[in-house]
């Protein structure tokens, strides 16, 4: 899409970012185009397999939490989830001043052995990582609570959570 539409706002925005004309770029445009633009125009940080999309989560204690990935990567490897956790913790720490952010994996149970094969494979990687404050698994009921500051999941699940949350808001405001 970026090569077919070089004058689109997304293509122009990423070119400006690459050339240093702007410091940041955000768009409400196509998610796939944003992912491709980020990976090929700006590149990922060395060692990062894939970027993730994050969303803010309102917490019950009026703070904000973070959920990632919410749609950039439907299929993930365990190492990608760990990188999302590290990036999310850095984001929470440096942009929102969360001291030692609590990082969790979204799963169907709090126990270490719970979850799909991806979550089960990622869990020990999170445990062994000294770059984050890993607190274990959280369940769907914890998403808007204050259990974790950063909740990590694959983009398929995260996008479902995001769209479900949007539908709850729409239902409540009617």
What spans do the regions from the language model cover?
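Short coil/turn connectors at secondary-structure junctions
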Residues: 19-23, 30-31, 48-50, 61-65, ...
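Short beta-strand segments
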Residues: 27-29, 56-57, 66-71, 106-107, ...
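Short glycine-rich anion-binding loops that position phosphate/pyrophosphate groups of nucleotides
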Residues: 30-32, 110-111, 156-159
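Short acidic, glycine/serine/threonine-rich loops at helix termini
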Residues: 36-41, 79-80, 115-119, 162-165
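Glycine-rich phosphate/diphosphate-binding loop of Rossmann-like nucleotide-binding domains
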Residues: 74-140, 149
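Glycine-rich phosphate/nucleotide-binding loop
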Residues: 39-53, 59-63, 67, 146-174
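N-terminal glycine-rich phosphate/adenylate-binding segment common to multiple enzyme folds
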Residues: 1-50
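Short, charged beta->alpha transition segments
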Residues: 12-16, 50-58, 90-94
């Amino acid at each position: 899409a970026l090569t077919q539409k070089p004058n689109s706002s997304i293509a122009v925005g990423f070119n400006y970012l690459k050339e240093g004309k702007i410091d940041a770029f955000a768009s409400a445009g196509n998610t796939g185009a944003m992912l491709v633009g980020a990976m090929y125009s700006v590149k990922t940080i060395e060692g990062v397999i894939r970027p993730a999309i994050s969303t803010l989560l309102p917490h019950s204690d009026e703070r904000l939490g973070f959920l990632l990935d919410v749609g950039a990567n439907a299929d993930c490897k365990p190492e990608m989830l760990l990188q999302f956790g590290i990036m999310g913790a850095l984001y929470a720490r440096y942009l929102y001043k969360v001291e030692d952010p609590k990082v969790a994996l979204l799963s169907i149970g709090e126990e270490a052995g719970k979850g799909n094969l991806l979550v089960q494979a990622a869990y020990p990687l999170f445990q062994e990582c000294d770059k984050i404050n890993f607190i274990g698994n959280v369940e769907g009921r914890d998403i808007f609570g204050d259990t974790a500051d950063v909740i990590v999941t694959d983009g398929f699940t995260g996008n479902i959570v995001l769209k479900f949350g949007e539908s709850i808001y729409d239902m409540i405001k009617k």
